[in-house]
């Protein structure tokens, strides 16, 4: 089946990854308004949670304005067609949190691990399947391992019961060849019935291009967000990806103009820091740093009189991964002690 004949599954992440862009401070009214617009525009799923997934609200990652369940319930009140999705990182969220999210209305879960740690997802994937959820394996920081090793990890998630596996460019560090190689490796390793997905970040301005290449390589699901609302320079902007898909003649099933209106009229005004490629977010992609480190690094830079870029580049040199936000202050203090 070619790209024009098959339907692309459009997975919106404005209300989960987009949390990072405003330090997890969406109001319930904001969440409801955005979800209603997305639902009316025809997206397939709407992911809802703290930026770091279920139970992510904490000192380490940042406290949310509301609980995950309050946000999910607010979305459940307004959506009529789209499925509600959520994110779970083993070690942060538990199966008890997943059951509560399911009871609140979530029917899709993406179980996320570092790209070489799929083995820690087994319990959560198996439990999600027992609930009857659409269960996705989400391999974060996929640039940090080879395509062949990524395929090995993907097969583990598949063996636990995941019916879709994502290549996740958490650092926005990959180019089109990197994406192509990883999807080819996954397609060769996985059962043909297992779907694949792409989660791109825009730190090198390649979020849309990488998503297009993924679809060309047989990718079934595409993550994107209104106005690119997400960590770092954001995700692939949903309205831009859909416009490009429309020009390519692809079947996406969404209303482009409704998405454009929602991006500019609803989402962009909420940004307290522009979601864009700039000096700091470009450093994320260039150094291969976890995108949600951005706001934490800027806080540390202000506190200690440093440049955020220097902190981010050093984090990349040390190959820090998601979950190591506490190391940002350590890096800042090291830079203070040992200035270049």
Curated annotation (Swiss-Prot):
List residues binding substrate.
Answer: 16-17, 170, 199, 290
Top-level division of the source organism's lineage: Bacteria
Q: Does the keyword Lyase apply?
A: yes
Looking at the Swiss-Prot or TrEMBL record, what is one Pfam family this protein matches?
DmpG_comm
* Marked site: Transition state stabilizer: 16
Keyword list (alphabetical) reads:
Aromatic hydrocarbons catabolism, Lyase, Manganese, Metal-binding
Which major enzyme category is it? lyase
Entries under InterPro entries matching the protein: 2-IPM_HCS-like, 4OH_2_O-val_aldolase, Aldolase_TIM, DmpG_comm, DRE_TIM_HOA, PYR_CT
Q: Which residues bind Mn(2+)?
A: 17, 199, 201
GO BP field? catabolic process; L-leucine biosynthetic process
Q: Which SUPFAM superfamilies match?
A: Aldolase, post-HMGL domain-like
Q: What is its EC number?
A: 4.1.3.39
Catalytic activity as recorded in UniProt = (S)-4-hydroxy-2-oxopentanoate = acetaldehyde + pyruvate
What positions does UniProt annotate as the active site of this protein? 20
- Tell me if Glycoprotein is a UniProt keyword of this record: no
Q: Which family does it belong to?
A: Belongs to the 4-hydroxy-2-oxovalerate aldolase family.
Question: What HAMAP family does this protein map onto?
Answer: HOA (MF_01656)
Q: Give the protein name, as stated in the record.
A: 4-hydroxy-2-oxovalerate aldolase 1
Question: Where does this protein come from, organism-wise?
Answer: Paraburkholderia xenovorans (strain LB400)
């Amino acid at each position: 089946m070619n790209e024009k004949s098959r339907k692309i599954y459009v997975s919106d992440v404005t209300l989960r990854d987009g949390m990072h862009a405003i330090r997890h401070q969406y109001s319930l009214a904001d969440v409801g308004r955005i979800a209603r617009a997305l639902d009316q525009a025809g997206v397939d799923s709407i992911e809802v949670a703290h930026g770091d997934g279920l139970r992510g609200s904490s000192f380490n990652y940042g406290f949310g304005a509301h609980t995950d369940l309050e946000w999910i319930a607010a979305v459940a009140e307004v959506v009529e067609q789209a499925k509600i999705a959520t994110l779970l990182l083993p070690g942060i969220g538990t199966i008890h949190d997943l059951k509560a999210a399911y009871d609140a209305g979530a029917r899709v879960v993406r179980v996320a691990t570092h790209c070489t740690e799929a083995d820690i997802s087994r319990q959560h994937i198996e439990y999600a399947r027992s609930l009857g959820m659409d269960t996705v394996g989400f391999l974060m920081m996929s640039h940090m391992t080879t395509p062949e090793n990524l395929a090995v990890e993907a097969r583990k998630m598949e063996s636990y019961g995941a019916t879709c596996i994502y290549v996740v460019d958490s650092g926005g560090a990959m180019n089109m060849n990197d994406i192509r190689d990883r999807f080819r490796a996954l397609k060769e390793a996985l059962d043909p019935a297992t779907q694949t997905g792409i989660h791109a970040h825009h730190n090198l301005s390649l979020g849309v291009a990488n998503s297009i290449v993924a679809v060309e390589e047989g990718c079934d699901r595409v993550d994107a967000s209104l106005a690119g609302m997400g960590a770092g320079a954001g995700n692939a902007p949903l309205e831009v990806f859909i416009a490009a898909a429309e020009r390519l003649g692809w079947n996406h099933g969404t209303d482009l103009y409704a998405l454009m209106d929602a991006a500019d009229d609803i989402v962009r005004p909420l940004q307290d820091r522009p979601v864009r490629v700039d000096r700091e977010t470009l450093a994320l992609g260039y150094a291969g740093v976890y995108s949600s480190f951005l706001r934490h690094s800027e806080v540390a830079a202000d506190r200690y009189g440093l440049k955020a870029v220097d902190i981010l580049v050093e984090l990349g040199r040390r190959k820090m991964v998601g979950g190591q936000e506490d190391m940002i202050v350590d890096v800042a203090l090291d830079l203070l002690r040992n200035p270049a």
